[in-house]
Regions:
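Generic beta-strand structural signal
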Residues: 26, 35, 87, 140-142
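Extracellular attachment/recognition segments
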Residues: 114-150
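Surface-exposed ligand/attachment interfaces on beta-rich extracellular proteins
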Residues: 35, 45-56, 64-88, 97-120, ...
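Residues that act as N-cap/strand-start positions at coil-to-secondary-structure junctions
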Residues: 25, 77-79, 133
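Residue-level detector of beta-strand structural context in well-folded domains
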Residues: 22, 81-83, 137
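Intrinsic low-complexity, repeat-rich intrinsically disordered segments enriched
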Residues: 1-66, 70-72, 95, 102
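Substrate-binding and catalytic surfaces of secreted/luminal carbohydrate-active proteins
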Residues: 92
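Short, structured beta-strand segments at or near domain termini in extracellular proteins/domains
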Residues: 159-171
Length: 171
């Protein structure tokens, strides 16, 4: 059943496609796209000067991921980690937190595996900071693995310190 203005339209009266004048408001429930590869078509708003490949928003997802942390030299003996992601179309934003409870012999750079989606292009840059000392961090993603290092070419974190990082990339 569809209600338009003060009229109610039953399923048997609905033709495909449905064209309605004005805005559509859902007062309860969700708008569900029931077929893979379909979504919201923005082609009526074409305004880019480049070569367009798609104006269809067909994917949105958010969730959590579990960062698996090691070091490029030696080994970290204990850590806590938490990650979140948002995927809109082909664009993914990852954020994550790592707390080093015991660095062990870890040195070099921090390696983080387990990103939810593989990057289409290697070496997309990330940004982060050491929450404990304020040092800026950088790094990159290759596939689903990230490498984090300190701008000053120092090991990015020590026992008892935490880092927060973020990266946005294309899949």
């Amino acid at each position: 059943m569809l209600k338009v203005a003060n009229s109610v339209i039953n399923a048997s009266q609905i033709a495909t496609p449905i064209t309605l004048p004005g805005n559509v408001t859902l007062s309860t429930g969700n708008l569900v796209i029931g077929t893979a590869g379909k979504g919201i078509d923005f082609s009526v708003t074409s305004s880019g000067s480049g070569t367009m490949t798609s104006e269809l928003l067909a994917d949105y997802e958010e969730g959590t991921w579990t960062p698996v942390v090691t070091s490029s030299i030696g080994s970290i003996t204990a850590y806590t980690a938490d990650g979140k992601y948002t995927k809109i179309g082909r664009q993914v934003t990852l954020t994550w937190y790592i707390g080093i409870t015991n660095n062990g012999t870890g040195a070099g750079s921090i390696l983080v595996a387990g990103a939810s989606f593989a990057a289409a292009v290697s070496n997309t840059a990330l940004f982060g900071f050491n929450q404990s000392n304020g040092n800026a961090l950088t790094g990159a993603i290759t596939g689903t693995s990230l490498e984090v290092y300190n701008y000053a070419a120092l090991y990015p974190v020590a026992t008892g310190q935490t880092i927060n990082c973020s990266i946005t990339y294309i899949v």
